[in-house]
Amino acid sequence: MIPGEIQVAAGDIELNVGRETVSVNVANHGDRPVQVGSHYHFYEVNDALVFDREPSRGFRLDIPAGTAVRFEPGQARTVQLVAYAGKREVYGFQGKVMGALEGKA
């Protein structure tokens, strides 16, 4: 092994297998680019991103950890979201949830 070398198993790694997903059409109505990270609660993204937010409650982008999606001004696209797992509690971001996702609206 070479120092710093990373050895990975052969084959592809499937992400988020069996988790609930939803597709959302999103448009950036702002005058600046908006970048959203892989684990950001999509329901609470920048208000310049216009979309039906309710279906995104409890979901994040279905992309590899540590990556992001950038929305340029005036750009519209469809993104795939995946449900949060574990305790399904959300804290921080814009403070719109601050607790359990289930049983609150």
UniProtKB/Swiss-Prot annotation:
It is found in: Cytoplasm. Keywords: Cytoplasm, Hydrolase. Its EC number is 3.5.1.5. It catalyses: urea + 2 H2O + H(+) = hydrogencarbonate + 2 NH4(+). Gene3D superfamilies: Urease, beta subunit (2.10.150.10). It comes from the Bacteria. InterPro entries: Urease_beta-like, Urease_betasu_sf, Urease_subunit. Pathway: Nitrogen metabolism; urea degradation; CO(2) and NH(3) from urea (urease route): step 1/1. It is an enzyme of class 3 (hydrolase). GO terms for cellular component: urease complex. Its main location: cytoplasm. GO terms for molecular function: urease activity. GO terms for biological process: urea catabolic process. The keyword Cytoplasm applies. PANTHER family: UREASE (PTHR33569:SF1). Belongs to the urease beta subunit family. Heterotrimer of UreA (gamma), UreB (beta) and UreC (alpha) subunits. Three heterotrimers associate to form the active enzyme. This is Urease subunit beta. It comes from Pseudomonas putida (strain W619). The gene is ureB.
